[in-house]
Regions:
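Gly/Pro-enriched, hydrophobic low-complexity segments
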Residues: 1-86
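Short, solvent-exposed mixed-charge patches
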Residues: 91-92
Length: 92
């Protein structure tokens, strides 16, 4: 059922990097999540970021406006996704 998930990405107009992402999922009762990237770092030329993970209790028609709800502080912070002890090993 994951194949039905819908994803949205917001790219920074100056850096062309994704600042936010949102997704609507249907498994286990479904829901909407909104993630905000922070703590950008590069290791071995690969970009890594952490995320603030928000829950959005919205109607289906509001999904495409989830960023507006974030900007108005209308989303609930569920967790932080923080990458630790990252290592990048070159392959041959």
């Amino acid at each position: 059922k994951d194949f039905e998930d819908i994803y949205l990405y917001w790219f920074n107009k100056e850096t062309f990097k994704p600042d936010y992402l949102a997704y609507k999922f249907y498994v286990d009762g479904g829901g909407i999540r909104f993630r905000v990237a922070y703590n950008e770092r590069y290791l071995g030329g690969i970009r890594f970021v952490d995320y603030e993970n928000y829950e959005a209790t919205l109607r289906d028609s509001e999904f495409y406006d989830v960023d507006v709800f974030y900007e108005r502080n209308k989303l609930k912070l569920l967790s932080k996704i923080e990458l630790e002890d990252i290592s990048v090993k070159p392959s041959n």
